[in-house]
Amino acid sequence: MDNVKYLSQSVDYLGFLQTKLRDLQGIATLTYELIQNADDVRTEDGKPGATQITFDLCDDALIVENDGVFREADFDRVRRIASGGKREELETTGAFGIGFIAVYQITDAPEIYSSGRHWTIRPDQEENRRVEERSAQLSGTRFRLPWRLRSWKETAVAAGETS
């Protein structure tokens, strides 16, 4: 049995995601954002971390892997959407903290495997239960993006939001 640790993620999550997705549409944007994420990965001492990226289209998900690893700062940025946390890191491509949102075009619950962690992000959950954290051993970083099953409206209704 897995020991699951829940962490909070703050923002009017569904409304913000839906609004920002209007600017992040299309497979080209999604691909760019995932490549940019790999490009932005750094080692703890600031050196470039990812040198390879692969995309694997599976029946149940899109799997994107790179050979870099998430630092604590990278995990924090995923939890604090739109924080602009990369602005001070001149070597990074991203700056505004919204690119990862592009994954919600195709998934309801993105998963991140990196640095001994497996996160599943569930935007339709309460703020303090949106990020499920488990331990996982994997070299590099993997994004598992299970194909979306519901529309945004269905997701908002399931979460108790009607606006």
Which residues does each PLM region occupy?
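Well-ordered, non-membrane alpha-helical segments in soluble/globular domains
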Residues: 154-163
